[in-house]
Swiss-Prot record:
Full protein name: Dephospho-CoA kinase
Native species: Ehrlichia ruminantium (strain Welgevonden)
SUPFAM superfamilies listed in its UniProt record: P-loop containing nucleoside triphosphate hydrolases (SSF52540)
Keyword Protein biosynthesis: no
A single GO molecular function term of this UniProt record: ATP binding
Length: 201
């Protein structure tokens, strides 16, 4: 089993790239954003964790994500402590996900994790792929999601620079030109990896 980690700025197209690995080489994808969403929605322990740090963000046992975002945008010591606890929960779920797939006939696992390198999730990867888009396209994508400029700038500050990501990665995929171009890069990376590990799909 080969573990691929995706790193890239917010709005760079990591989820698109992950979906193409799933489509073309049947990779199983660990989507950390989706995991966190499910934790906020359904995990009573995480809901209680949120409530213990940010009481106004839980109403009738439901996490108010808009209210929680307010605390994220403050990004103070309280948020950092909460985030550390949440990351440890996500890390365990990721480990269980990898272990579960290692027991199956799974060729590729793709980790679609924000702050992959910054939070040291890349340490369990065989290869790291840098997903890159130009800053104008990133902003356009995020505006469509309804993200504020302040939120975009905060998240950008928390992330490594593109130069650092590229230096710490094995491959780079550029998004934004066309979907066919992204697909060709995915297939080329699969070919290179298979050549290195001596196996074929």
């Amino acid at each position: 089993m080969i573990i691929l980690g995706l790193t890239g700025g917010i709005g760079s197209g990591k989820s698109l790239v992950a979906s193409y690995f799933n489509r073309f080489v049947k990779a199983v994808v660990f989507d950390a954003d989706n995991v966190v969403n499910n934790l906020y929605n359904f995990d009573n322990n995480v809901i209680e964790l949120v409530k213990s740090y940010f009481p106004t963000s839980v109403n009738n046992g439901v996490v108010d994500k808009n209210d929680l975002k307010h605390y994220f945008l403050l990004y103070d010591d309280l948020w950092i402590k909460f985030q550390s606890e949440l990351h440890s929960i996500v890390w365990k779920i990721q480990k269980d996900f990898i272990l579960s797939n290692s027991r199956r006939v799974t060729k590729y696992v793709v980790l679609d994790v924000p702050l992959l390198i910054e939070a040291n999730y890349h340490n369990c990867c065989d290869f790291v792929i840098h997903v890159k888009a130009n800053s104008i396209l990133q902003r356009q994508r995020l505006l469509k999601r309804g993200m504020s400029r302040h939120e975009f700038e905060l998240i950008s500050r928390l992330q490594l620079s593109d130069n650092d990501r590229k230096r710490l990665s094995d491959f780079t995929i550029r998004t934004g030109l066309s979907k066919n171009f992204v697909v060709s890069q995915v297939k080329d990376i699969v070919f290179q990896i298979d050549s290195r590990v001596g196996c074929k799909i």
